[in-house]
Regions:
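Active-site- or binding-pocket-proximal scaffold segments within functional domains
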Residues: 1-379
Length: 379
């Protein structure tokens, strides 16, 4: 039995950048034999006493390298998002065998893609390797696009107010028509683990008022019952309106924890990783308890510091020109049970004279509803 791990990074992020995100660090920690696949992606193979026990795929974020075949799809479902989803899907289709396990991990828009990929895999099934040549990448990508098209057509939450429906329908005429025999069922996914899923996905388009909106949203709020565990690390301090998080509807085995700092102070990528190291320190043992193999000797030492300076992800152009909206954390979402817990680092940070870089602004957790009277509002 092999565990297959797909790691989907955030916008503009790559594995080899000087300050890797938590997604790249998790992939690196998995160890094994790592090879440069193509177009910014990497694959890993971990064997123990002979048999392969874990394989991994790292995919860079939107706005990095890409495959020309996907350009029309990207114009339809958002730059790079479809490519991340389909490349993760074809990797799993190429390697998965019945009885194997799957873990999917993502950050930011890669988190939205991870959640969508999980629903795609358990909802549509993986490609049947008996009906095509998995090593022929172009053939695999075309079949992956066809499978994604078929799945997307049946998921109303994947397309809202899309002005591009006609383009997508035309795309459906250019890819193979797949039948149920072209798929193999996947009974379960062990875990989906995400850092700060953002809900604005798709093609930026003009909106009244002059700022960029998004054509549709792809991150579902319901985690499939075939996904056994969901882990979500959320930012308390991110304030960009179009980076508002997409929560999961509460159910058993979903854990959503709020951490201090901005979007990238949770998902990583800054030269000062003091805050993002805490979210990673929380995520790794959760994944390990559900099948992920990793060795911290494969990455730099983690040094979380809850009172370290944070960062203002929205302080530079073009984000500084777009609307701001403080995060909201309702005590329940969708009428369900308590949706969140507050990490202990929030309590350590609350009331301290900490700064947000580059602006000298204190974090105020009472203002966004995490604390009242000095006590956390969540378990």
């Amino acid at each position: 039995m092999t565990t297959h791990v797909v790691c989907l990074d955030g916008t503009g992020q790559t594995r080899l950048q000087p300050n890797p995100t938590n997604i790249a660090l998790i992939f690196n920690a998995m160890g094994g034999l790592i090879v440069d696949a193509d177009n910014g992606s990497f694959e890993s193979t971990l064997a123990v006493n002979g048999p392969v026990v874990q394989v991994g795929k790292y995919l860079p974020g939107v706005g990095t390298e890409g495959i020309p075949l996907f350009k029309l799809v990207e114009q339809t479902v958002g730059a790079g998002i479809a490519e991340q989803i389909v490349r993760g899907y074809t990797f799993l289709s190429r390697n998965y065998e019945p009885g194997d396990e799957i873990i999917i991990i993502g950050f930011s828009r890669g988190a939205a893609a991870a959640r969508c990929l999980a629903g795609f895999v358990v909802g549509q099934g993986l490609l049947n390797p008996a009906n095509y040549h998995p090593e022929n990448k172009n053939a695999a990508y075309l079949r992956g696009i066809a499978a994604w098209y078929q799945y997307r057509a049946g998921q109303p939450w994947l397309a809202r107010d899309s002005d591009l429906t006609d383009i997508f329908l035309k795309l459906g005429e250019t890819v193979p028509q797949l039948t149920p025999a072209d798929f193999v069922e996947v009974e379960r996914i062990l875990a989906v683990a995400v850092f700060d899923t953002v809900n604005s996905i798709g093609i930026p388009k003009p909106e009244p008022g002059g700022w960029l909106g998004y054509d549709f949203v792809i991150a579902n709020t319901d985690l499939s019952p075939k996904v056994l565990n969901g882990f979500h690390a959320l930012s308390a301090d991110e304030n960009r309106a179009n980076f508002f998080p997409t929560y999961w509807t509460p159910r058993n085995n979903i854990t959503q924890v709020i951490f201090p700092g901005s979007h990238s102070d949770v998902g990583g990528g800054y030269p000062e990783p003091d805050l993002s190291d805490r979210a990673l320190e929380w995520m790794l043992p959760n994944l390990a308890s559900h099948g992920l193999r990793f060795d911290l000797h494969n990455i730099r030492a983690l040094a979380p510091n809850p009172t370290a300076d944070g960062h203002d992800d929205g302080g530079s152009f073009p984000w500084c020109e777009l609307p701001k909206k403080p995060r909201e954390f309702p005590t329940t979402v969708f009428g369900g049970s308590p949706a969140f817990t507050v990490d202990s680092s929030i309590g350590e940070r609350w009331g301290k004279p900490v700064n947000v870089l580059p602006a000298n602004v204190r974090s105020d957790y009472e203002a966004i509803g995490l604390f009242a009277g000095g006590k956390p509002l969540y378990p």
